[in-house]
Amino acid sequence: MLTYQAFIQSPGDTFLNLGFLTIRWYGLLISISVVIGLFISKKLAKSRNINPQYISDILPSLIISSIIGARAYYVIFEWRQYSGSNFFTSFNLFNNVIQIPSFIAIWQGGIAIHGGLIGGFLCILYFCKSKNIHLKTFIDILIPSIILGQSIGRWGNFFNNEAFGIPTDLPWKLFVPIQNRPIEFINYQFFHPTFIYESLWNFLIFILLITIFYKQNNKNSVRPGFISCLYLIGYSFGRFWIEGLRTDPLCIGGLPPFCDGGLRMAQFISIFLFSSGLIGLFFLRLKSYKNKTRNNG
């Protein structure tokens, strides 16, 4: 008797290969995210009386700083992968093979979203100071595009066969080729598609933030920083429990897949960001209350 077993499987990481040019899914998805994010952020900027040109002006430096931050964060916590005999890697430069530091080879994988957020925030902070733009308002404008970009970008993990979870037999299970499986689970075929969980969760947050953004405008109750605080709370809550399923965490004092004897760095950062969001909402509420009291008095 034949039985049908449902599962999902990556078709590979390459979208298009022309010989002289290879376009990979991850890069394509990031490019799509940037274009969509640029369009959305410009519309949101206009609705809050911020010059939309500022979005175009910051975009190149924001992308670069986010990539540097995401890579640096990963390398710091996975330094054992890049030290000693692994410090150099081969790179084909116009048919000449040269040796470069392996931590530069970002195309080989290894970035972390929390590092990207740190790098991006520093870029935004500098930009707002140099242009005399209200920081919290400007971040609120960018946040919906950022979370949508995270939602779209997570599908790059699907095509790369990475960032999946522990073994499972659920109907939506992911088949992972043997070469991509953690050594601890080498005999398992199917795993939690945690990137899908996070992608869907992030998209729901995007819908929520956009809805609240325009409701704030319609009611003339714009509170700079409110959208950012909701993002910190919502994203961190989802990332915390999804991270608990993953087999490739960045660890402090422990080793994957479960950081035994240590701590999952993403969960630690999620707790910090979640708490920061709650504290931010508290102070926004407190400020609003004081303003009402002052006006009524």
From Swiss-Prot:
List of residues binding a 1,2-diacyl-sn-glycero-3-phospho-(1'-sn-glycerol)? 154
Topology in membrane: Multi-pass membrane protein
Q: Give the pathway annotation.
A: Protein modification; lipoprotein biosynthesis (diacylglyceryl transfer)
Q: For this UniProt entry, what is the primary localization, expressed as one broad class?
A: membrane
Which EC main class describes this enzyme? transferase
This entry's Enzyme Commission designation comes to 2.5.1.145
The domain of life is Bacteria
Keywords of the record: Cell inner membrane, Cell membrane, Membrane, Transferase, Transmembrane, Transmembrane helix
State the GO CC annotations.
plasma membrane
Q: Where are the transmembrane segments?
A: 20-40, 58-78, 104-124, 133-153, 194-214, 225-245, 266-286
Q: One GO molecular-function annotation for this sequence?
A: phosphatidylglycerol-prolipoprotein diacylglyceryl transferase activity
Query: Which compartment or compartments is the protein found in?
Result: Cell inner membrane
In the record, the note on similarity to other proteins reads: Belongs to the Lgt family.
**What biological function has been recorded for the protein in this entry?**
Catalyzes the transfer of the diacylglyceryl group from phosphatidylglycerol to the sulfhydryl group of the N-terminal cysteine of a prolipoprotein, the first step in the formation of mature lipoproteins.
Q: What is this protein called?
A: Phosphatidylglycerol--prolipoprotein diacylglyceryl transferase
Source organism per entry reads: Prochlorococcus marinus subsp. pastoris (strain CCMP1986 / NIES-2087 / MED4)
**Gene name of the record:** lgt
